[in-house]
């Protein structure tokens, strides 16, 4: 049975059965005066908190489904607190035979607080997520393609969160550890062991690793194109 098609409009949002879309953006935007900050910058901690709070403020607008909102919350926490994006990017752009073991080890041991803060990329990512949650009417003054751009952002974010949810499910139910997927990025590494030398459990992981590897590789290339850190 289809949901009743009800739309509620307020001064700040448009509410449909599927989404709550923002009309007023001011409280979610960040001043554009910041430059890239290194680990020793006194502003670093403040800027991180500013970004983190704004991403979290957007959670109610990501979806009306609790599971999707919870996945978004967990993903934002992971991006700010655990993800080693430089290692992930290096593994994507350097095939197995071209990787430096020393470089991989160095990147693996670098803590989040020791890295340069990519303020420009974070700002663009915030704008991307804000677009995915925003309402733009299609009028003569508002070009259709601009409104459509917001829809594309919403669809991309939805696919990203769906794949992230599948990762969480794999960690919980399929014997794949969190460190394998989100810390070591084992799915992005080509195993040097022949299939005959892999045990039964390891062989079962290969098809799933391929799916996650293809998605994360595409995501890295998308980030390179858009200048984001999705």
From Swiss-Prot:
Keywords: Sporulation
GO biological process, alphabetically ordered: ascospore formation
Described purpose of this protein according to its UniProt entry: Involved in sporulation and maintenance of the mitochondrial DNA. Is probably involved in a pathway contributing to genomic integrity.
UniProt record similarity statement: Belongs to the IRC19 family.
The protein, known as: Increased recombination centers protein 19
Organism: Saccharomyces cerevisiae (strain AWRI1631) (Baker's yeast)
Gene: IRC19
């Amino acid at each position: 049975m289809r949901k009743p098609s009800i739309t509620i409009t307020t001064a700040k949002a448009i509410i449909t059965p599927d989404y709550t879309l923002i009309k007023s953006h001011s409280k979610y935007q960040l001043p554009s005066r910041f430059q890239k900050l290194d680990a020793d910058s006194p502003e670093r901690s403040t800027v991180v908190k500013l970004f983190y709070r704004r991403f979290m403020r957007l959670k109610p607008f990501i979806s009306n489904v609790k599971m999707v909102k919870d996945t978004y919350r967990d993903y934002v926490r992971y991006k700010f607190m655990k993800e080693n994006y430089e290692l992930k990017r290096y593994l994507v752009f350097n095939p197995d035979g071209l990787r430096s073991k020393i470089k991989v080890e160095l990147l693996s041991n670098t803590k989040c607080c020791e890295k340069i803060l990519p303020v420009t990329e974070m700002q663009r990512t915030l704008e991307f997520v804000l677009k995915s949650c925003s309402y733009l009417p299609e009028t003569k003054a508002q070009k259709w393609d601009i409104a459509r751009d917001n829809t594309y952002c919403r669809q991309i974010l939805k696919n990203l969160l769906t794949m992230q949810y599948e990762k969480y499910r794999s960690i919980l139910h399929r014997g794949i550890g969190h460190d394998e997927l989100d810390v070591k990025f084992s799915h992005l590494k080509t195993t040097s062991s022949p299939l005959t030398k892999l045990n039964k459990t390891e062989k079962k992981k290969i098809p799933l690793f391929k799916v996650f590897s293809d998605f994360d590789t595409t995501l890295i290339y998308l980030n390179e194109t858009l200048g984001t850190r999705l």
